[in-house]
Amino acid sequence: MPSFDIVSEVNLVEVKNALDQSNKEITNRYDFKGSDARVELADKIMTAYADSDFQLDQVKDVLLGKLAKRDVDVRCLDYAKVEKVSGNKVKQAITVKVGVETDLAKKLVRLIKDSKLKVQASIQGDAVRVSGAKRDVLQETIAMVRKEITDFPLQFNNFRE
């Protein structure tokens, strides 16, 4: 029985490379001279530091540009609230979301079941496994999911006959 997995994966090596490039650009830019603007990575959480809210937005713009150039989908980023640090400085945590969260997985399963296509969807950890009798029906399912879910980056892999 043919099947495939719906997953959400992010290449963390590319995220680290984009972060390094961002820090290099921030240290060399004239408008950041003498400031404490930087981006740090710890596990899957990036933290952007700056002297003001305006500079923080500039740091995030640089980071998003570098991530986009390295083919990292920026829809997988989750922004926390901006926090005041000592003095006038601000910081913001940016989480890289990896894997299909349970509420999104339930939404995917419900969407697939409501579509009346002859496929079965099941949640397996941080992925959704979809299996069906025919390959054509699975391809229709992929097209339908791509059309319906646009706010979160999804990949379709492990396609088996």
Curated annotation (Swiss-Prot):
Domain of life: Bacteria
UniProt protein name: Nucleotide-binding protein LHK_01423
Taxonomic placement: Bacteria, Pseudomonadati, Pseudomonadota, Betaproteobacteria, Neisseriales
NCBIfam families on file: PRK05412.1
Function: Nucleotide-binding protein.
Gene Ontology CC annotations of this record: cytosol
Assigned protein family: Belongs to the YajQ family.
Entry-linked SUPFAM superfamilies: YajQ-like
Gene Ontology MF annotations: nucleotide binding
Pfam families in the cross-refs: DUF520 (PF04461)
Swiss-Prot/TrEMBL keywords: Nucleotide-binding
